[in-house]
Amino acid sequence: MPEQGLKTLPHQEILTYEEIIRVAEYAVRNGITKIRITGGEPLIRKGIVGLIERLHRIPGLVDISLTTNGTLLEKYAHQLFQAGVCRINISLDTLDPERFRTITRRAVMDDVWAGIRKAEATGFDPIKLNVVVLKGVNDHEIPDFVQLAKEKPYHIRFIEFMPTGAGPYQKEHYIPTAKIIERVRKVAGISSLPPHINDGPAKRYKLEGGKGSIGFISPVSSHFCDTCNRLRLTADGKLRSCLFSDQEINLKPILRSGSKDIEAELKQQFQQALSTKPAGHKINSDKIPPLGRTMSGIGG
C-alpha cells in the first residue's frame, strides 16, 4: 500500500449498481455462471450487500464469491452469507501484527481476525486465505501458515509475487512455487488433490493431519493463461480479458447512451474482448510491460 494511499475515482466515473446489474444479467444470459466481487476493498462501498442480493436473484448465476482484506468482515459476514455469497477469500500476507502494519500501513490485524472468526462462525466454507510470498519479507512465515492450516479448516493459498502495476517490479522478492513447496514439505506432508470446480488457478494439496488444505498459485513460473476463462469489469466500467494487459473496452458509454439496443452493443463488446484475449501474459519476460492500473483498480 502506498504511504499516501490510493487515488479515488470521482463518483460519476464509477458504475452504478443498476449498470453493474445490467452487465451481469447480460453475461449470465450468455454463459457466465460465476461472479467474484473484488477490489480494492468491496466492503467499503455503500449498499454492497444489496448489490449481492440482486446478483443472487439473476437466473442462471450459480456462484457468488468475494475477496476482501477482512477489516470489515466481522460487520458484514452474516449479511453477506444471507445475501448469497458462497465463498470468501481473505488477503492475509502475514501472521505478525507489526509486519502486517508495515505491509498495509494500518494497525487493524485484530479486525481481520475478528472477521475471519465471524465468517467461520457464520458458516462460510471454505474460507480461503491468500498469501503472497515475498522473499525477505514474509517467506519465513510459511511454516506458520502451514501450522494454521493444520489447526483450522482454512485453505491457505500461497501466491507467487507478481507485478501489480504499483511501481517497479522488485524481482528480488520473487520466490517460485517450486521453492515454496520445498519449504512446506520440510514441515508437513502434502499430497496433490484432484482438481475442483472452485479451485480457480490454484493447485490444491491435502495436508496430512490437518483440518485445512494448502494451495499454490503460480502466475509467473507456471502461468495458467491457456485455461483462463475470466473477464473483469472494473469499477469505472472497463471490460478486461487479461489481468496483465492494459487492453480494455469501455462499457460505460454504452450503458449511459440511452440506446434501445444495449443488448446488441454489449454482445459486440463482449465478443471483441473474448476474441482479443491474449494467448499469454508477459510478466515473466526480462522486460515487463508496465500496467496502466494498479491491481486494486483492476480486481485481482
Predicted ranges, named:
Residues 60, 154-155, 189, 275-282:
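Generic structural signal for secondary-structure transition and capping sites
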Residues 1, 77, 104, 243, ...:
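Short, flexible helix/strand-to-coil boundary loops that buttress conserved ligand/catalytic motifs
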Residues 14-37, 44-159:
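Radical SAM/AdoMet-radical enzyme domain recognition
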Residues 1-15, 243:
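Canonical Radical SAM [4Fe-4S] cluster-binding loop centered on the CxxxCxxC motif
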Residues 223-300:
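Radical SAM enzyme core and accessory elements
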Residues 34, 91, 99, 213-216, ...:
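Residue-level recognition of specific faces of alpha-helices
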Residues 25, 53, 147, 163, ...:
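Generic alpha-helical structural context detector
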